[in-house]
């Protein structure tokens, strides 16, 4: 745990020089984390991480859960095929666009109970829903690794975890600041995903934030084109509603 905190401090020092995370970086972070996890799946730590990951999705509706499990196992099974994905990235791609292109170019296929999880559309396969699945797996794994304090994660993976965590934190802070009544008020955090107003009071009234943003737990639509980001924020807000003993959980 001490090593993890020391690394975090070193990371913060270099954060200002870090470039924005690309879809390619996020995809391969997810890929590398899962490959790393599966490589050591016989160890107690990896089993704990895997169990925690699947526990985190058990309350999703059945289609979402099966989809996440499918992609998790699919990525874990391509440890020797990473080069297949090297040429499907284009500038400005989101994770969902990358995955969609991988599917359309037949470099990544999905199927569930013979029905398939992508459907033909104008002759091109398209992922059916849950477009930000790779991001969600990545974020869940980052949270789990961070919480469990697994210090044997390779340094480059750990650095990218922290890099993306910080970017996601900044995005959520910006999103919360856009809520009427909170604009310009969210200035600091006392811990990851815990926010304070300028007076130092912890913000806990996330029900009203949900209401003002017009967000539901799983049905999120925006008119600003930031569906994936706000969906992420909503899920984090949902988890923030479960604050225990004054600590972020």
From Swiss-Prot:
<keyword id="KW-0800">Toxin</keyword>
<dbReference type="GO" id="GO:0090729">
    <property type="term" value="F:toxin activity"/>
</dbReference>
<keyword id="KW-0614">Plasmid</keyword>
<feature type="signal peptide">
    <location>
        <begin position="1"/>
        <end position="20"/>
    </location>
</feature>
<keyword id="KW-0732">Signal</keyword>
<comment type="subunit">
    <text>The killer toxin is composed of three subunits: alpha, beta and gamma.</text>
</comment>
<comment type="function">
    <text>Killer toxin, which inhibits growth of sensitive strains in the G1 phase of the cell cycle.</text>
</comment>
<protein>
    <recommendedName>
        <fullName>Killer toxin subunit gamma</fullName>
    </recommendedName>
</protein>
């Amino acid at each position: 745990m001490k090593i993890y905190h020391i690394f975090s401090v070193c990371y913060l020092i270099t954060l200002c020089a870090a470039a924005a995370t690309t879809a390619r970086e996020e995809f391969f972070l997810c890929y590398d984390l899962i490959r790393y996890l599966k490589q050591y799946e016989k160890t107690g730590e990896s089993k704990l991480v895997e169990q925690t990951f699947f526990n985190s999705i058990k309350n999703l509706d059945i289609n979402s859960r099966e989809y996440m499990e499918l992609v998790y196992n699919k990525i874990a099974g391509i440890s020797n095929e990473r080069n297949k994905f090297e040429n499907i990235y284009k500038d400005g791609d989101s994770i969902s666009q990358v995955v969609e292109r991988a599917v359309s170019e037949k470099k990544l296929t999905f199927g569930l109970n013979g029905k398939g999880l992508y459907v033909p559309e104008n002759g091109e396969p398209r992922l059916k829903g849950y477009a930000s699945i790779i991001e969600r797996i990545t974020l869940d794994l980052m949270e789990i690794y961070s919480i469990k304090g697994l210090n044997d994660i390779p340094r480059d993976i750990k650095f990218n975890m922290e890099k993306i965590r910080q970017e996601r934190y900044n995005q959520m802070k910006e999103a919360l600041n856009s809520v009427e009544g909170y604009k310009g008020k969210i200035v600091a955090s006392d811990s990851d995903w815990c926010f304070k107003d300028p007076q130092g009071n912890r913000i806990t009234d996330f029900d009203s934030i949900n209401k003002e943003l017009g967000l539901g737990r799983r049905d999120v639509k925006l008119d600003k084109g930031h569906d994936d980001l706000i969906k992420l924020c909503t899920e984090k807000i949902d988890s923030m509603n479960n604050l225990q003993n004054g600590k972020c959980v």
